[in-house]
Amino acid sequence: MGSFEEAFKFPIVAWNKVCWPVEVGGLGIRRIGLFNQALLGKWLWRFGCETNRLWCQVIASKYGETSGGWCTRVGRGSQGCGMWKNIRKGAKSFFGHVLYVVGEGLHIRLWYDLWSGHIPLKDLYPDLFSHALGKDVWISELITITSDGGSRSWNIQFHQAPDDWEVERVDAFYEHIYSKMRRGVGVDSLFWKLTLNGVFDVRSFYNSLSAPPTISFPWKCIWSSKVPKRVSFFLWTAAQDSILTIDNLVKRNLHLVNSCCLCRCDGETVDHLLLYCKFANAL
């Protein structure tokens, strides 16, 4: 990213900033490791959505299933060799962006899984969870579906009947879970939180992994101007305060006299050289 002399090159901008999206001040260069992880996330999504496909059944048979069948167990020893081992490594970050949509409820746990919102019910209603019978139960064990599939009823049991002061809390709990159940009968499915339509895409997963800052940057003024790209690049480095002025060279431990090479009136910073120097003002 620039050079001071042919024998030695200074890194002008930190690589993590270069990899930020253009909109927040980077160059939009993808980090290969994170992009590869995002690509592998597509296979985790397919494994959860294509359970009847032969390849899913083979993988599940080899490694075993966990989390209601949405993912496999971690392979160990020689069992963990191969491509799936690397795919499985990204499961924790992947499932952090997944909600579960209840169909029959065979693969979704009432209290632990994210199906009724972004907080599991055990954390949203800790008082009721502490009194619940069978804390690790599947939703299918607690609902009764009418023959036409039009409505469902819950049968959640607690250690004791709620006290008078708890009745309102229990009513709010039931109102909450009823509101999150879709009508009709279907299979349990995944919903990707990072897209509006709930379908996984690589770009949204990559952006979550790279976690760029939410800052304002005049990227349109820099990259949309009708000037040569080298001029745009110079403006970008100036906006990053990364031009190799004497002030920045001193920060890189070079022993120089920090004085403007044009006016000799102040230190040669980016702001002084381009904005406040009397020679710059004359331009």
Where are the regions a protein language model picked out?
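A helix-boundary/hinge signal
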Residues: 1-283
